[in-house]
């Protein structure tokens, strides 16, 4: 041992995985062993990264904080996944986050890897005040058009949260909901933590549903393209015809003059 710490490198490594006392850190910094110095360098880098991420997440809630300052303590974010695909449901989510969050990597779902989205999904459900999810099937999308379907789904999500928000932020969707101040924000999922959280919940939920559909209809490749109009997907439609989950109002299906409607599979889930 060096400098009389009385601790092995392995013991120090284990303690650094938790929350070491300031006195312990100061003692270890006096240790001249190369292995201890390396452990502390790694620890310091991790602490710096976490501090920067906490600052980023705090800034990410600036929009919500403006509402809180006006006495609106419960602010929901709302976003959807699945406007553009030829097949599959439109999934919308609304999320109320607490005033203090620790959701490392939270961002617009399109900027987050699939693996990180899965982790964030669980962390959001654990930390959120309230979460709702709407699932609208192809028949409703065809009947309403995708814009009105998204508007309807967002309204349903925001009005069925178990904790009613005084304010809400949407990703570029203007809404009028009695008793709720709604701000529609372009690129809201990159500018509001609550909207970003909703985008993660919606995206992960929809991806799981498309993976389920892939098992039912393996020839279409739903697990890979998630219903978007890739060359393989369009070729599968031409070769095999549409499934009940294809949107009849989207090309090339619209030009096929199909008689049967798409499936009507609608759900409203209060996850928390």
Q: Language model features by range: what are they?
A:
Residues 1-76, 83-272:
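RNase H-like, Mg2+-dependent phosphodiesterase core
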């Amino acid at each position: 041992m060096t400098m009389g710490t009385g601790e092995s490198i392995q013991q120090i490594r284990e303690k650094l995985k938790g929350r070491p006392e300031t006195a312990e850190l100061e003692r270890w910094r006096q240790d001249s062993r190369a292995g201890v110095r390396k452990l502390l360098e790694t620890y310091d880098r991790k602490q710096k990264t976490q501090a920067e991420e906490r600052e980023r997440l705090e800034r990410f809630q600036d929009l919500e904080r403006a509402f809180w300052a006006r006495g609106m303590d419960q602010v929901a974010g709302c976003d959807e996944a699945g406007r553009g695909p030829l097949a599959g449901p439109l999934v919308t989510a609304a999320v109320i986050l607490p005033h203090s969050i620790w959701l490392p990597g939270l961002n617009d779902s399109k900027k987050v890897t699939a693996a990180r989205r899965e982790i964030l999904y669980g962390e959001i459900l654990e930390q959120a005040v309230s979460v709702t999810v709407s699932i609208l099937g192809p028949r409703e999308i065809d009947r309403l058009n995708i814009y009105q379907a998204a508007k309807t789904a967002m309204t349903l999500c925001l009005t069925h949260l178990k904790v009613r928000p005084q304010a809400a932020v949407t990703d570029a969707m203007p809404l009028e909901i009695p008793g709720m101040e709604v701000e529609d924000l372009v690129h809201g999922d990159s500018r509001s933590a609550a909207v970003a959280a909703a985008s993660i919940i919606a995206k992960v939920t929809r991806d799981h549903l498309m993976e389920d559909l892939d098992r039912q209809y393996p020839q279409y490749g739903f697990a890979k393209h998630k219903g978007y109009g890739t060359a393989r997907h369009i070729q599968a439609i031409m070769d095999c015809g549409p499934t009940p989950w294809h949107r009849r109002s989207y090309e090339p299906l619209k030009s096929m003059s199909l008689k049967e409607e798409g499936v009507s599979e609608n759900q409203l889930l209060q996850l928390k």
